Swiss-Prot record:
Subunit: Part of the 50S ribosomal subunit.
GO biological process entries: translation
Pfam family, one: Ribosomal_L31
GO molecular function: structural constituent of ribosome
Gene: rpmE2
Keywords, alphabetical: Ribonucleoprotein, Ribosomal protein
Keyword Ribonucleoprotein carried by entry: yes
Domain of life per record: Bacteria
Protein name: Large ribosomal subunit protein bL31B
GO cellular component: ribonucleoprotein complex; ribosome
Keyword presence, Cell membrane: no
PANTHER family tied to this protein: 50S RIBOSOMAL PROTEIN L31, CHLOROPLASTIC (PTHR33280), LARGE RIBOSOMAL SUBUNIT PROTEIN BL31C (PTHR33280:SF1)
Protein family membership: Belongs to the bacterial ribosomal protein bL31 family. Type B subfamily.
Length: 86
């Protein structure tokens, strides 16, 4: 392998904020945030909105989506102003 062209592969702590779950996975993700893990070591830290711990496909449970999409937000605010052509 050529030196200097491959990304830095290291353990990273991912935090699923919707269910407050933490897990360590090997990744090449770059982040400036760090967190001290249960083993006393400091790891890079990254937050997630959805992971296998919270996604309905993996959990088998439906959940209310808290972050509404931009289009749905636009339609909610301005949907009443649509003109109907006759």
């Amino acid at each position: 392998m050529k030196p200097g062209i491959h990304p830095d592969y290291r353990p990273v702590v991912f935090h699923d904020t919707s269910v407050d779950e933490y897990f360590v996975v090997g990744s090449t993700l770059k982040t400036d945030r760090t967190i001290e893990w249960k083993d006393g070591k400091t790891y890079p830290y990254f937050t997630l909105d959805v992971s296998s711990s919270s996604h309905p496909f993996y959990t088998g449970k439906q959940r209310v989506v808290q972050a509404e999409g931009r289009i749905a937000n636009f339609n909610r605010r301005f949907g009443q102003f649509t003109s109907e052509k006759e």
